[in-house]
């Protein structure tokens, strides 16, 4: 008869969790998913995050000229220099995300005679916990705070790459971002009306997803210097060097990708079209289009309809508090003597941006 493991200590339970991960061969558990892609937790955070500390994350940017330069006489010219405060500070506040799961000792005890069942019980709880975290973080990342009273939601890319002028064929018209209630706010603490050089690049495709879209895309690339880095991102796995995730990406809707692929199918390869259609990816100027299901639904205040969100992750990036990147903790349940709880915590900013004019751009059908 199997020995009971009821009444185990916290240390013993943590040992069981670790042993479960290390010793038992996983059996796949069926799980329905809310999304097909989880780029935030699978790619963006692991590869492009920066580790921070302090009360907030800050960077400095020059948004004004000193007015000290100019042509003058050849000799014995009196200096006329003025001291200007040209630096401004962009500030992103940290936000706290937490989720967890509960393990009941009785359930563990019931399955103690069957190693696979005991493993699957623990695994299923953990899978549900991690899926919940991935869902929540994906939605929050590509969204915005509900209102000025919302002090718990992070600010994502649409705090920095914003809607501009209706029918704009392409300019730095992206003004202050919107809360979900339609009111504006100043991402980073600096208003774009006061500092117009913080405005991001925006173009309105007016729903015309044809060759004219490529014209808008090409112009946006040139105006923002959005291009594939000369030095590729490489990573070594078990001594094998491979290309890592690219720091410049287009995120877009299914409708945009369908039309882009249609243009690619109809192109004359002998001419050497800029639009690629091979190797399982659709690319433009060597930059990949990534599907994001969230963009299949229009947003009045964030991005309009059928957006192309171009992001340079070396300029705009998530910041995570050091030692709090999905940090796990296990403890006894305070109100159930037969249970343990496991939590994962993430302290992060959402996105911080060093310079909105160089972070990418937004092309969409304006609301």
Model feature map: region roles:
Residues 249-253:
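Short, conserved beta-strand edge motifs with alternating hydrophobic and charged residues
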Residues 101, 105, 113, 119-137, ...:
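Internal, well-ordered alpha/beta segment that forms a basic, Gly-enriched binding/recognition surface
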Residues 133-144, 206, 221-224:
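A generic secondary-structure signal for well-formed alpha-helical elements
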Residues 2-19, 24-38, 42, 154-233, ...:
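Sequence/fold signature of self-assembling virion shell proteins
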Residues 110-116, 366:
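Glycine- and acidic
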Residues 138-160:
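Short, glycine/acidic-rich hinge or "gate" loops at secondary-structure transitions
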Residues 149, 254-258:
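Short, internal active-site loops enriched in acidic
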Residues 33-105, 160-163, 170-171:
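Assembly/oligomerization interface modules of large self-assembling protein complexes
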């Amino acid at each position: 008869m199997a020995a009971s493991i009821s009444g185990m200590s916290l240390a013993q339970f943590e040992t069981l969790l670790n042993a479960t991960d290390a010793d038992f061969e996983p059996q796949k558990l069926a799980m329905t998913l809310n999304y097909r892609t989880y780029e935030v937790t699978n790619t963006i955070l692991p590869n492009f995050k920066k580790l921070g500390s302090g009360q907030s994350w800050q960077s400095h940017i020059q948004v004004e000229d000193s007015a000290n330069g100019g042509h003058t006489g050849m000799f014995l010219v009196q200096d006329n220099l003025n001291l200007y405060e040209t630096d401004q500070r962009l500030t992103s506040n940290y936000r706290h995300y937490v989720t967890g799961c509960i393990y009941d000792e009785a359930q563990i005890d019931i399955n103690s005679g069957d190693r696979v069942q005991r493993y699957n019980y623990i695994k299923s709880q953990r899978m549900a916990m991690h899926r919940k975290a991935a869902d929540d973080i994906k939605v929050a990342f590509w969204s915005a705070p509900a209102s000025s009273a919302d002090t718990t939601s992070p600010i994502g890319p649409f705090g920095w790459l914003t809607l501009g002028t209706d029918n704009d064929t392409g300019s730095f018209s992206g003004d202050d971002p919107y809360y979900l209630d339609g009111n504006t706010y100043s991402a980073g603490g600096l208003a774009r009306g006061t500092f117009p050089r913080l405005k991001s690049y925006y173009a309105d495709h007016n729903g015309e997803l044809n060759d004219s879209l490529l014209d808008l895309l090409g112009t946006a690339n040139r105006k923002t210097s959005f291009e594939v880095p000369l030095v590729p991102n490489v990573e070594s796995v078990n001594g094998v060097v491979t290309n890592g995730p690219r720091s410049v990406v287009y995120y877009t809707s299914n409708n945009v990708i369908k039309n882009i692929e249609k243009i690619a199918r109809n192109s004359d390869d002998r001419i050497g079209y800029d639009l690629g259609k091979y190797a399982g990816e659709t690319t433009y100027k060597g930059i990949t289009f990534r599907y994001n299901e969230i963009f299949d639904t229009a947003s009045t205040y964030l991005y309009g309809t059928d957006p192309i969100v171009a992001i340079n992750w070396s300029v705009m990036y998530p910041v995570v508090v050091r030692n709090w990147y999905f940090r796990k903790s296990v403890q006894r349940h305070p109100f159930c003597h037969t249970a343990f709880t496991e939590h994962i915590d993430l302290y992060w900013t959402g996105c911080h941006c060093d310079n909105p004019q160089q972070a990418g751009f937004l092309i969409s059908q304006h609301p």
